[in-house]
Amino acid sequence: MRSVTEDFIPCNREEIETRLERKMDGNMRTGRERQQRNLGIDLLRIFCMFLICILHVCGQGRAMVRYAGREEVWYSVYILETAAYCAVNTYGMISGYVGVRSVRRPSRIVELWLRVFWYSALGTLIAVTFFHLPVESDTLYQALFPTMWKTYWYFSSYVGVFVVEPYLNRLVKSLGSTGKKKLMITLFLLCSVFTMVPRVANRDFLGIGAGYSFLWLSVMYIIGACVRELTDQNGPERQKQECSEPGGAETSITETENTAGVKEQKEQDSEKNVDFLHRSGGLYGMLYIICVLVTWVSKILIENWTTSVYGEARYGRLLFSYASPTIVICAFCLLMIFSRLKCRGRVLRELIQFFSPLAFSVYLMQLQPYFWEYVLAGRYQFIAKLGPAAACLMVLVMAAALYLECTAVDLVRMAAFRLLRIRRVAQVITDFALRPFAELTEQENREASGEV
């Protein structure tokens, strides 16, 4: 083990200053993050899972059955599904937004896998034993090997993202503000805009899988991480801190004698950075609504036109996909809106802290194979027979009820996990599995906390 003095043997004065700046900045930042959790992001998790419930009510629940002569009901409910379609992308961006500045805890993925296995295996056992539902080989494989069989496609893809997360973080942190923006724009154009037309023709030349893939979640992770880094570097509080500290992030101590012209240029660049990601929440809200309407209207117009020309609806999913540019922009807008929310009030904060850890289980419960096929399928078809306004209201009510239903079930799982001390079990499994990589993991944690 190295001594304390060995860590601070300087090569020159600049190295001392750089190390001290980095150490002080990292300590202040991590201290603030430990004390002030961003409840806006936790609220966004809850909201996104509610949107996913809307998708499942409309889709598998068949609330969007299109009856002849009742197209107005289908159109009205479809706008709700369009507004909710960005939820998965937003979840991916949240992972990057939080993960780029969080201390990595490998046992977390083991805990999540045990939660997934709880719902897949135990749910199958209950369905077969108590409800005498049929067992097929494929269903059994899905229950016992939920990750490899993609029982829950999002979790299967997220496992890959979790493995490469440290390297994605290093990529983002190695870039300057301009580089991060260029990376975000490049990924958006390459993976979303340029794949739009080939996707309509069922051509997936980048292997994005219409957003159902590890590659796509990695792209969303990087965008979320870039947003976090840019907002932390260029936020109003950060700017004030840099202006009050000699030799801040824009100028080191040894560079204070630079020309006034260079300083003015940096100030102008800083103002541009602030303008880019610190617009008002109302602007992002308007942009979200515009993108939802564009996606919704385009689907209706394209399908009606192709029906009149070809006799059947075609190309309606031009903008209706996880990888669609408008859907990605919607997800980005939600992230920007909720990340700056100030959740005041003790009751509101307690509700957010209660529901947020349970949000992911709402997804697991709904995607459980037997629940998906025998409980959720066609459950809400009666909604399609209501009027337009009543149908929209009922979709929202049923989605909220489904969310609370799954949350109540997960409380049982949470109590069982505490009784079985699953967190401790996950930590033991992780320590044993990662013993050869312990030094690398410690290095990654130091980098994430700003100590290196």
Spans of model-derived segments:
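Interfacial loop-to-helix transition and helix-capping segments at the boundaries
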Residues: Y75-V88, Q142-S157, R199-M220, W296-C333, ...
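Solvent-exposed interhelical
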Residues: V163-L189, V227-E242, G261-L287
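Transmembrane alpha-helical segments and their boundary/interface "anchor" motifs
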Residues: C48, W74-S95, G99-V128, H132-V161, ...
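Aromatic-anchored segments of alpha-helical transmembrane domains
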Residues: F50-V57, Y119-V128, L187-V200, Y288-N304, ...
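Membrane-proximal cytoplasmic C-terminal regulatory module of class A 7TM GPCRs
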Residues: R413-A448
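Juxtamembrane "helix-exit" motif on the non-cytosolic side of transmembrane helices
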Residues: A63, T129-S137, M196-D204, S298-G311, ...
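Alpha-helical transmembrane segments of multi-pass integral membrane proteins
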Residues: L125, E303-L419, E439
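Intrinsically disordered, low-complexity terminal tails and inter-domain linkers enriched
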Residues: T5-T30, Q233-H278, R446-S449
